[in-house]
Amino acid sequence: MLNFWQILILLVIILIVYMYTFKFVQKFILQDAYMHINELEAPPLNFTFQRNRGVDCSLNRLPCVTDQQCRDNCVISSAANELTCQDGFCNASDALVNAQAPDLIECDPALGLVHVFSAGGDFVVSQTCVSTYRDLVDDTGTPRPYLCNDGRLNMNLNTVQFSPDACDCSSGYEKMLFRQTALARTIPVCIPNRMANLYRRVYN
C-alpha cells in the first residue's frame, strides 16, 4: 500500500513527463506548420545551382551552343587562349598559332611622340604612341584644337624647342599668346581680326 508521500512523488514524476512530452509535441506541430507555410509561399520549383568557373575546356568537352557560353564557363588557362564553340563543344585554341606580328605604328618624333610597347602575360604585346607635349599634341599626333587654329603650324620638336614662332596665322587672323600661369607653356592662338579687341582681355 502506497503512502501519501509516495503517491505525491509519483504524481510529480508523471507531471514532469507530461510537460516534456507536451512541449516536444507542440514544437513538432509548430515546426511542421511553419514548413507547410513556407512551402505554400515558395514557388513550385526552386532550383539553386551555383559553382565556380572551374572547367578546363582544353582537357574537358563542355557542351555549348554559343561562344559566349564557353567564355562564361571555361577557365582561361592562358591569355593566348581563344574560347570558341565548335561542333557543339567548347574548344580552347591557341590564338597565337596563326597570328601575325602587328605592324609597327608610326610615331612622329617631330610632334613629340614616342613609341611605347606594353607586354602582358604570354607575350601579348600592345603598342601605342605617347605624346611628350600633351598640352600641344595628343597621343594620335593631332594638334590640340586651340593650338594655332586657323593657321599653319610648323613644329619639329625632335630638334627645336617649341615656341610661339612655330605658328603662322592665316590672313584675316591675328596671333595672340595665351599664358595660363608662370609654369605653363605659352600657347599661340589665331583670333579673327574683328574679335581681336575682345580677346585682348584674355590673350596677349
From Swiss-Prot:
It comes from the Viruses. InterPro entries: PIF3 (IPR007703). It holds the Pfam family PIF3. Per os factor that plays a role in the initiation of host midgut infection. Unlike PIF1 and PIF2, PIF3 is not involved in specific binding of occluded virions (ODV) to the host midgut target cells. Forms the PIF complex together with PIF1 and PIF2. The complex also interacts with per os infectivity factor PIF0. This is Per os infectivity factor 3. It comes from Autographa californica nuclear polyhedrosis virus (AcMNPV).
